[in-house]
Amino acid sequence: MAKNKKDEVEVIKEGGRLEKSLVAILDNASRLQGPAVEKYVAYMRRAHPNDTPAQLIERLENRFILAVTGSGSAVGGAAAIPGLGTVASLAAVGAETAFFIESSALLTLSVASVHGIPVHDHQQRRALVLAVALGESGMQIVQKTVGSSAKNWGPLVMSRIPGGAMTNMNKSLVKKFVQKYLAKRSALLFGKLLPAGIGAVIGGAGNRVIGKGVVRNSREAFGPAPRSWPESRIIEPDPDGILEQRRDVE
């Protein structure tokens, strides 16, 4: 009996460590600054100058799916997305989880940028990233906080939510995210520990499924893309020839 109680305590402690690690990853991901996101979107627009907003968003989504699927198939493999930093010392959850969350954050904030929604405040970025990752449950928390049931709820996060309400909303989003994310990832983690080959297939396929869920949530949050680019968003040329060097990765 005493042993069972001890095991239960260890499980609780481990859960607490995992939660702290996830929160640390979330904080790092939501610190992606507005200028960095704008630079990434501008890079993509220069690489594909004829893309409409809808086409560019689809391109952003495809790059995201490709990156997270690759990271699931080969944990620790390189799947480069401009704008992402390296997250180290995340043994409790793993660098792959950090990469997935940061990639989700970059996708979410980039899509917001294409929609003309600036996300400069750290708390707003965190709320938006969490709500999109959660999908329907995130939407419900946002709608409850702002008192609106708008179908495309992404812009609601950018509305004037009082500081205390924003803090409480983020706490609710974090709690729900930790519960939901750990439940999904635990099954994938087991699959990746299977013999080589089988684990890679499960890891890649599992990440692809979760990634497609993030894409779907993003579409529901922001709604249809703008039909055209605002005239004010002029894209500078590529004086250093960087795009020519990287076109083979598109």
Show the residue positions of the predicted features.
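Terminal, membrane-proximal amphipathic helices
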Residues: 1-78, 102-250
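Transmembrane helix boundary and interhelical junction motifs in multipass membrane proteins
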Residues: 81-92, 197-198
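Hydrophobic core segments of alpha-helical transmembrane domains in multi-pass membrane proteins
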Residues: 89-95, 201-206
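Glycine-rich active-site/cofactor-binding loop and its immediate structural neighborhood
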Residues: 90-96, 100-106
